[in-house]
Amino acid sequence: MKKEFDFILIGRITIDFNPTDYYNNLENSSLFKKYIGGSAANIAIGLSRLKNKVGFFGSVSDDQFGNFVLNVFENEKIDISRIKKTKDHKLGLTFTEMLSEEKSTILMYRDNVADLQIDVSDIDLDYILRTKILVISGTSLAKSPSREAVLKALFLAKNNGIKVVFDIDYRPYSWKNLDEVSLYYQIVAQNSDLIIGSYEEIQLTSRFCLENPENLIDDDYAKYWLKFVDLIIIKNGKKGSKLYQKDKKLVAKIVPVKMLKGYGGGDAYASLFLDHYLKNESDLENGLALATSAASIMVQSHSSFDLPDYQKILEFKDNALKSDPDLVQKKEWNAFKK
């Protein structure tokens, strides 16, 4: 059956305000540029720019900011037929504080936000059956009714042979406590095909299913989660990232660059990797090299969604490999070998 969409995403949409008078405290910043934000929104835009057909389950405010989001999505050729407007809730606002090349913080306003108002009635099987891959962003599990909507989408996809990607995307705001986080993350992770998360996010996801998870290393987590998923990526900031399958382990370094800000690379990383995973799953080494290259490009950019075209990323990756042929290394690995 021919699929209309390559990817459908469900998750966070926000409005970002990034200072143009950066390397300054927020209290001293007076000039800001407005962008669409939120991990799921950024990844959707990245995937669409890579010539994928993209859909989205979401909820936005019924106001000027909601209209801004829908206009951006339409301009980026993302289907908005399953994005509803809510009159009683506002989109979350994110103000970024770019203190230096290395240090950035965020100030968020996420009380009763619009993106968490997607409901089980907004999720329909017909739309899910039209995609090859469903991408779930973990922030959408933070509160009801969004978390129930996500779980419905998850199980509809799983029961109908649609691949599920879980991008953990942990943000402490909106959650009541860590037990709640770990519980819902574990449910989704154990029913996914692919997990992407930082070491800290994987640790948080594993609190109820592994003993003393704080004492475990990447390999330990991979051995456990590969009982459920086909592939797991564990990111470790400046130390790079690792990709695991049952019989494959790849270790990727970062590409050193002069940073403008200390955030924004993760969404570009996910966009490039998922694009390559769908189109050329047999060559994951190249996919990981593209992903880590895209992340390095994005930390030089003022926004978190302004992904350059594929040719520029490819050229950046090729130059990085010339400088360091061991940018991505294959390691001996078998997850279930005694």
Curated annotation (Swiss-Prot):
It catalyses: 5-dehydro-2-deoxy-D-gluconate + ATP = 6-phospho-5-dehydro-2-deoxy-D-gluconate + ADP + H(+). The keyword ATP-binding applies. The keyword Transmembrane helix does not apply. Disulfide bonds: none annotated. It is an enzyme of class 2 (transferase). GO terms for molecular function: 5-dehydro-2-deoxygluconokinase activity; ATP binding. Its EC number is 2.7.1.92. SUPFAM superfamilies: Ribokinase-like (SSF53613). Pathway: Polyol metabolism; myo-inositol degradation into acetyl-CoA; acetyl-CoA from myo-inositol: step 5/7. Belongs to the carbohydrate kinase PfkB family. Catalyzes the phosphorylation of 5-dehydro-2-deoxy-D-gluconate (2-deoxy-5-keto-D-gluconate or DKG) to 6-phospho-5-dehydro-2-deoxy-D-gluconate (DKGP). This is 5-dehydro-2-deoxygluconokinase. It comes from Mesomycoplasma hyopneumoniae (strain J / ATCC 25934 / NCTC 10110). The gene is iolC.
